[in-house]
């Protein structure tokens, strides 16, 4: 049986995250619920402390690097005397890990390799949330993924790997007790208007411009719809993503006053926004490994219209728990699919079935239970 766990992740977001960060959210939600004593090792960003005691069996240890240190050792000389991977192992050592302890690396094959090189005998698990090429991973690696789609992806590269499915989850209390639902009037939308809703990254892989173009088509034939887009459309990104966000802003400006760009919201706030939606559209252009927005929307009792690319169709079943977008996706096809979904006589029943599906399969408590079963079975 596993006696202690170190959860860690690539040094981008601090934990708990203050913006949309599905990987770090999974770590924080499961770590605080599991009965296995654990420490989370992550980067320390501005505004965070070095340490957070979550409860009596979970704590967060944030690894900070000064600007001078990063400039001197990580940028100029690239001779880092105390790299992130070693600092994680130092946290593990301070935790008095034993031969029955496990290090779980989230979504960074590079970090997994670095830790494995420094601790070749450590018990380790690779937890992948996205589809990458697993260069340099052990052929018999133990891996957790959120969907059958992602399991098949990695099995094709690593046929001898031991791969288990542990899905993502949602906090049902956030909907049922803690949410303060927004009203359409809060955004200047009249109650009779049908609100199309999108939440996620404003990036090409999420298909935001396609949705905006589809909405433009819809406005030509109906005057009872509005579009709400939640996501950071003014990020500090450069290059292709910056150009894409500029295109999104220009399209949204053209669609005013019927299109509202809300901007980014925190993971805690997003639960208040789904109340605005009559239909949540997820037109992902890439192979979506799972999609947190889909289960969040379904958990809020909202109908979803999703891309069939990737893992979403494992729980969004056409005509049962949601609706599927036609392929190939075009502005015209998405507009048609939105019209069909909104006109469906089974819309409310489908929404209820989607909500029940999420309540039965994806509460964080059930995700944590499944996680414990997997790791304890691997390391008996």
Model-derived regions, located:
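Short alpha-helical donor nucleotide-sugar binding micro-motif in glycosyltransferases
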Residues: 264, 272-277
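A short, well-ordered alpha-helix in the C-terminal region of glycosyltransferases
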Residues: 346-361
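Conserved donor-binding/catalytic core segment of Leloir-type glycosyltransferases
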Residues: 189-206, 212-216, 227-230
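A short helix/loop element that forms part of the nucleotide-sugar donor recognition site in Leloir-type
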Residues: 176-189
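Nucleotide-activated donor-binding/catalytic signature segment of Leloir-type glycosyltransferases, i.e.
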Residues: 119, 240-265
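N-terminal strand-loop element at the rim of the active site
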Residues: 9-17, 33-79
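Short hydrophobic beta-strand element within catalytic cores of glycosyltransferases
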Residues: 303-306
